C-alpha cells in the first residue's frame, strides 16, 4: 500500500484505510526546473581551527572544568583534537541511563563501555568528540544546520521524545552509520587532509555538544566536545536545559556559528519544530571574542592529541566541499546533463562509483539501466519540495545509490549541497532492501559470527554473545511464515524493515511488543537497537579499541562477518562479501528493483525528509521503468511487504508526501504504481 502523508505514522498503522491515497493514480510532475546551483567553495583554515579550540578552552576554564575538543571539515577530515588535562582524568562511559553507582543500566551494543579502567587503561574521549563534530557537519548543509541535540530529537523511539503514542523519530537508526568498517567511508592517518566522506569512530552522535561550523553562510565543518564524561543522549532534547558539553561547544563555534535562518529551530517535521541548541550567549561563562589566542594557551592546560587513523597531531586546514580534493564535486562529464549532479571521486579525481552493470550471471542491471535509474531519481529530487531545507521552497537535496542483488554498488550520485550523512546511508538503505528481499537472507544471518556485547567497568571486562541467526526465527514467527527470508517471495522496502525494527509494534504504540528485529524492553536503547547494530557491532568494537590503543588491529572494509575473540585478543573478518558492507539501515528511503519478477538490485535515497526519500526512490524507479520500456521496475504489487499483516497490523511499503512538487499541484503521485 502506498500511503500519502496525512496522519502520523503511528495512526497510519492503526487507521490504514484512512491513510490510503485515492484519485489521480500515478500522477507525476511534468514541469522541469532549471539546473540547481553549485555550492560555494569555502574551507576552514588553520587559523579558524585554532580559534575554535581556543574559544572552547576558554569556556571550559571559566567553568573550572576540562574538555576534549575536536574540529572536522565538511567531509569529516579531523583538523584538530585537543585534550585538556591528563588522560586518566578524561574518563568516558557510553550509556543512555546510569544506576546510583554510575554504571550503565542496559547492557548490549555500545552500552556500558567505560574507559579508562584498570582492565583497559585506554581512552575514548577523543573518539566521542570526533563523532560529535562529524555529526554536526554531516547532518547539516548550506540549507539546514542540525546539531547533535537535533539528532537526539529525531532518533528516539517517539517523536517528539517523551510524547508517548507518537511514531519513532524520522531518522530512527541513523546513529549507526558512517562507521569505520564501512566499505564506503574513507580513512586518513597522514599529515594532509584527503578525500571524504571520512569515517566516524562511533557513528553519528545524539549527545548534545556537537555543532556545525559556517563561513559566510557556507557549511565548512563541525566542532564536538566531551567534558561531562557521559556519551549518551538527551531524553528530552526539546527542553531548555543545556549540557556542559553543549555550552563549551557553543562557545567554540562563536563567529563560525550557523546562520539563524537555517538553524534547526526554523525547520519543522510533521508539524514539530526541531531544536538546535538549549544554550545561548547569555549562558556562557566566558566571552569568546576575548578568548586568548591558541598560541597563548599554557601547555599545562592541555595539548593537541594524535588519534590513530584520524588526526596526526598537527592542526591542519580543511577541504572545500565541492572541490575534487574533498571527494565530492560537480559532475564534469555527460552522465547527468542539466541535473546539477555531484559525484564521488578518489584522490586522483577519478569517479569512485560510475554507472556499471550488476554482477549476477543472468538478468543483471546494465550500465545504461543504472544510469537511467540515477537520472530519473535526480529528476524527481530536483522537482521535490525539500522538507528540511531553508528557505522554504527549496528543492530536496539527496544522495542516490543503486546496488545489485548482492549489494555491490553500481552507481551513486548526489544533489548539490546534499548533507554528507546521506551518502553512506543511501548505500545502507539500498543494501538493506536488496538483502531482506533476497532468498538467502536467513542463511546469511545464520552463518555470521557470534555478536559480542561488552561491559567495561572497574570490575573488568565482561563479554556475552548472541547469534545473529536468532533474529531469523523471531522474524518468521512474527510474520507468520516459516519460509520468510528463505524464498525471496516478499519485497521489503527499508520502511517495512524499519517497521519490524522498532521497539514497539505498531510503531509508536508504547507498551506494544517489539518488532522481531528489535531488542525487547529493558535491553533496547539508542546504543543497542537490535539486528541493525548486532550485524556490525563486532567491527565497531574492534575499531574503537584499536583506535584507543588496546592492541587490536584496525578494521578492514566491511562491517559484517567480523569474528571478535571473546577475550578481545584479536579479530578476523571471515567473509569478504559486501551484502551489508557498510551496515544496515532502518529508516525509510529504499525499494528493491525487479526484472520480470526477479530481484536484480535496489535503489536507496537519503538526505531530506524520509517521505521525500521514499518518494524519490520509488517514483524514480517507476519513471526509470517507463523510460526503459518496463525492462526493470518496482516489485509486483502482490509481493510487496504491505501485503503482510503481522500481529494484525499491515506493514508499510512506501509513504509519499502530499503535494510534493515545487512546480506542480499533483497529488497522490505514488498511488497506483
Give the role of each language-model region.
Residues 15-18:
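C-terminal motif of bacterial Sec signal peptides marking the signal peptidase cleavage site
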Residues 1-8:
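Bacterial N-terminal signal peptides that target proteins for export
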Residues 23-673:
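Flexible, solvent-exposed loop/hinge segments and secondary-structure transition points
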Amino acid at each position: 500500500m502506498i500511503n500519502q502523508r496525512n496522519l502520523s505514522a503511528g495512526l497510519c498503522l492503526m487507521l490504514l484505510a484512512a491513510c490510503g491515497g485515492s484519485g489521480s493514480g500515478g500522477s507525476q510532475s511534468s514541469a522541469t526546473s532549471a539546473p540547481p546551483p553549485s555550492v560555494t567553495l569555502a574551507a576552514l583554515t588553520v587559523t579558524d581551527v585554532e580559534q575554535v579550540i581556543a574559544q572552547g578552552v576558554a569556556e571550559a576554564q571559566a567553568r573550572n572544568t576540562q574538555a576534549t575538543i575536536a574540529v572536522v571539515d565538511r567531509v569529516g577530515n579531523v583538523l584538530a583534537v585537543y585534550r585538556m588535562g591528563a588522560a586518566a582524568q578524561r574518563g568516558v562511559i557510553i550509556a543512555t541511563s546510569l544506576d546510583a553507582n554510575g554504571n550503565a543500566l542496559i547492557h548490549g551494543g555500545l552500552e556500558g563501555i567505560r574507559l579508562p579502567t584498570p582492565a583497559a587503561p585506554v581512552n575514548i574521549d577523543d573518539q566521542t568528540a570526533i563523532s560529535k563534530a562529524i555529526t554536526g557537519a554531516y547532518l547539516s548543509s548550506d540549507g539546514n544546520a542540525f546539531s547533535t541535540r537535533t539528532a537526539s530529537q529525531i532518533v528516539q523511539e517517539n517523536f517528539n521524545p517523551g510524547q508517548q503514542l507518537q511514531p519513532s523519530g524520522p531518522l530512527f537508526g541513523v546513529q549507526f552509520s558512517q562507521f569505520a568498517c564501512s566499505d564506503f567511508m574513507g580513512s586518513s592517518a597522514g599529515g594532509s587532509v584527503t578525500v571524504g566522506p571520512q569515517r566516524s569512530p562511533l557513528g553519528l552522535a545524539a549527545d548534545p555538544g556537537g555543532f556545525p561550523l559556517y563561513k559566510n553562510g557556507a557549511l565548512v565543518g563541525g566542532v564536538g566536545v566531551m567534558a561531562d564524561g557521559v556519551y549518551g543522549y538527551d531524553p528530552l532534547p526539546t527542553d531548555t536545559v543545556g549540557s556542559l558539553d553543549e555550552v563549551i561547544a557553543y562557545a567554540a563555534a562563536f563567529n563560525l556559528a550557523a546562520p539563524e535562518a537555517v538553524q534547526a529551530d526554523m525547520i519543522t517535521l510533521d508539524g514539530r519544530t526541531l531544536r538546535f541548541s538549549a544554550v545561548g550567549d547569555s549562558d556562557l561563562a566566558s566571552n569568546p571574542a576575548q578568548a586568548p589566542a591558541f598560541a597563548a594557551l599554557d601547555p599545562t592546560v592541555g595539548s593537541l592529541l594524535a588519534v590513530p587513523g584520524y588526526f596526526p597531531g598537527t592542526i591542519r586546514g580543511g577541504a572545500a566541499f565541492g572541490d575534487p580534493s574533498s571527494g565530492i564535486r560537480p559532475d564534469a562529464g555527460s552522465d547527468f546533463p542539466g541535473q546539477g549532479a555531484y559525484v564521488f571521486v578518489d584522490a586522483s579525481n577519478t569517479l569512485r562509483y560510475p554507472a556499471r552493470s550488476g554482477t549476477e550471471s543472468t538478468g543483471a542491471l546494465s550500465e545504461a539501466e543504472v544510469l537511467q535509474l540515477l537520472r530519473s531519481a535526480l529528476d524527481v529530487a530536483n522537482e521535490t519540495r525539500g522538507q528540511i531545507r531553508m528557505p522554504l521552497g527549496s528543492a530536496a537535496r539527496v544522495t542516490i545509490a543503486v546496488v545489485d542483488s548482492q549489494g555491490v554498488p553500481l552507481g551513486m550520485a548526489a544533489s548539490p549541497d546534499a548533507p554528507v550523512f546521506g551518502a553512506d546511508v543511501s548505500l545502507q538503505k539500498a543494501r538493506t532492501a536488496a538483502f531482506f528481499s533476497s532468498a538467502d537472507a536467513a542463511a546469511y544471518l545464520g552463518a555470521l559470527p557470534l555478536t559480542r556485547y561488552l561491559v567495561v567497568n572497574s570490575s573488568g571486562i565482561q563479554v556475552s554473545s548472541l547469534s545473529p541467526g536468532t533474529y531469523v526465527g523471531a522474524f518468521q514467527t512474527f510474520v507468520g511464515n516459516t519460509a520468510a527470508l528463505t524464498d525471496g517471495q516478499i519485497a521489503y522496502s527499508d520502511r517495512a524493515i524499519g517497521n519490524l525494527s522498532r521497539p514497539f509494534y505498531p510503531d509508536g504504540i508504547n507498551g506494544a511488543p517489539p518488532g522481531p528485529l528489535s531488542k525487547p524492553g529493558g535491553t533496547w536503547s539508542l546504543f543497542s537497537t537490535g539486528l541493525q547494530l548486532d550485524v556490525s557491532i563486532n567491527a565497531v568494537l574492534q575499531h574503537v579499541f584499536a583506535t584507543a590503543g588496546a592492541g587490536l588491529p584496525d578494521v578492514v572494509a566491511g562491517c559484517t562477518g567480523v569474528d571478535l575473540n571473546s577475550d578481545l585478543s584479536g579479530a578476523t573478518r571471515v567473509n569478504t562479501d559486501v551484502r551489508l558492507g557498510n551496515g544496515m539501515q532502518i529508516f525509510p528511503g529504499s525499494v528493491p528493483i525487479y526484472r520480470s519478477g526477479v530481484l536484480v538490485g535496489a535503489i536507496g535515497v537519503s538526505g531530506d525528509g524520509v517521505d521525500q526519500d521514499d518518494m524519490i526512490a520509488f517514483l524514480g524507479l517507476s519513471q526509470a521503468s517507463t523510460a526503459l520500456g518496463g525492462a526493470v521496475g518496482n516489485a509486483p504489487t502482490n509481493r510487496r511487504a504491505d501485503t503482510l499483516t503481522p500481529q494484525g497490523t499491515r506493514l508499510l511499503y512506501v509513504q509519499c508526501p502530499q503535494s510534493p512538487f515545487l512546480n506542480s499541484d499533483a497529488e497522490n503521485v505514488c498511488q497506483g504504481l
